[in-house]
Amino acid sequence: MKVLGLDPSTKTGFVWLEDTDGESLHVVQSGEISFPGEKGMTRVQSIGQRIKDDLIGFQPNLVVVEGYGFANKHTLVTLVEIGTAIRLALHESGIPWASAAPTQLKKFVSGKGNMKKDGIMLEVYKQWGFEGTDNECDAFGLAALGLYAGCPDLDPHLKADQRKLLHAWKAENLRLFI
């Protein structure tokens, strides 16, 4: 199974994970998408096109996108523009996708719904050995959530609280796993 995790922001983090042996997660590719100097609808169009052209070319079984966070009202409009461009590109491409709220991501990775970015980075490294930017680590957690949901054989590797959140998230997105 191939899963893409996306952390929408002005530097959108992405991580491709595969379950290659039924026992571990394999990082295919990771990075950030940004368009310095572009603003507004030009940036929205560029992000949507990049998602269609580059990332969807991997033909993922599932894409997990971080849901909208409402903590910073100053960046909310920009994040909604970027998030909408990503979701529209996925919809137009017919790629199955699901959203995970920021608190769900944090609880899955760390067991705490209010973990800061540097804490998420540390937890991702400790549990899975992945190092990257804060955006890439969020994307890793999202991709891992989707991969564990789609590959029950990986489930024993999770802690009890991770398993609980995973099963609740999977129930919310059951249409993707039937």
Which ranges hold each PLM region?
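Phosphate- and other anionic-substrate recognition elements at nucleic-acid/protein interfaces
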Residues: 1-178
